[in-house]
């Protein structure tokens, strides 16, 4: 949901993120915290994230230097290391130290300030 919003606002070709389950409630949907079935399973380690970034770039015919990778944990660092722009999002100190940009406050829409 969140990455789709950023994608649509910026006209980005492709985004990929975990998909969380939403349960219907009396007023609106609520996130359950459970993942919807995803081809990569519930756990996506650093090697898988890096592989998917490289495969996605190849499918789109772009260099990884044109990709943006955003993460918060050590398992995101391999993916962030091959992207042209690495963004630490409310990340652990080690990730913030290695990222090109750190977003420490606010929502995902803060990325718009970086890429516009």
Segments predicted by a language model, with ranges:
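C-terminal cap/substrate-recognition subdomain and adjoining C-terminal extension
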Residues: 1-116
């Amino acid at each position: 949901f969140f990455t789709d919003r950023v994608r649509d606002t910026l006209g980005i070709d492709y985004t990929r993120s975990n998909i969380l389950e939403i349960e219907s409630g009396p007023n609106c949907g609520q996130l359950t915290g459970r993942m919807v079935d995803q081809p990569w399973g519930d756990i996506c380690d650093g090697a898988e994230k890096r592989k998917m970034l490289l495969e996605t770039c190849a499918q789109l015919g772009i260099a990884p230097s044109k990709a943006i990778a955003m993460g918060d944990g050590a398992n995101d660092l391999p993916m962030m290391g091959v992207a042209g722009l690495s963004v630490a999002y409310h990340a652990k100190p080690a990730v913030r130290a290695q990222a090109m940009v750190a977003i420490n406050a606010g929502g995902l829409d803060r990325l718009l300030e970086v890429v516009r």
